[in-house]
Amino acid sequence: MAKISGRRPGRAATRLAAAAITAALVATGASAAFAAEPGDAPLFGLSGVDASGNAYTYAPQGDGTLSARVKIDSGWTGLAFVGQVDNNADNIADGRWQLGTAGNIYYYEGNSPAKKIGYGWDTYNTVVSVGQFGGGEGGDLLTRDDKGDVYLYLGYGDGTVTKRLKVGYGWDIYTQIAGNGDLDGDGKNDLVARDKSGVLWLYKGTGDQKAPYAKRTKIGSGWNQYNNLFAAGDLNMDGRTDLVARNEKGELYLYAGTGNAAAPYKAKALIGTSGWNTYRLFF
């Protein structure tokens, strides 16, 4: 396979990646079961890119655990971000965005060739696929630059996005930002952010593109024990959005969603005993 390294891989790589993720979901029955319940949390499974550029995916088993990994592709080097996106609100990923370290961002869907949707994105130190966050037609992207300014790109539903909208500032206080789904049961997608002292905060979504999130509320402290927080959609197939967290030892924990803003996550559950620090990106 052609290496990515800031440029797009060929159609074969795109097709293989989509097929591998779909196959992993179908093999567990997850795709069909979840597709019958539209309007719940996204069912994306969990995928990762390791330091060598190999990409793997894990399907949810329905109890919070994950299947054995399936290799998607190789040569995924030079990437700063990969994010899955659901563009038609059926809770299944339709495609993915990939941002190269050179600042070019592409969209991939099915057998279609890669679509370049932007450039100059190396100005951002964080990019998050947040789902339908600002009332757009498709999934949106949230970004943060080195100054701490936050921008929202509304999705058109075909992988392309609008011009950016500045929706916040001062977010350089956070070391992790995650979100792709509804955490409080109001039907609007939310965000979580961890500050430098290890406190995790909830930003409830409003659905308003000009002010897409409400004032933050505290979830809890001690979250600096993790080096990666990622919102992978619904991993235990209960219809609620979950969070995965990895620590320095390479252990992976599931924080299952509750749908309650006052306590949006259940107690952590160990779902990966070791080896998860091989991944430098989750998507």
What are the language-model segments listed below?
Residues A2-F283:
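Trp/Gly-enriched beta-strand/coil motifs that build multi-repeat beta-propeller-like domains
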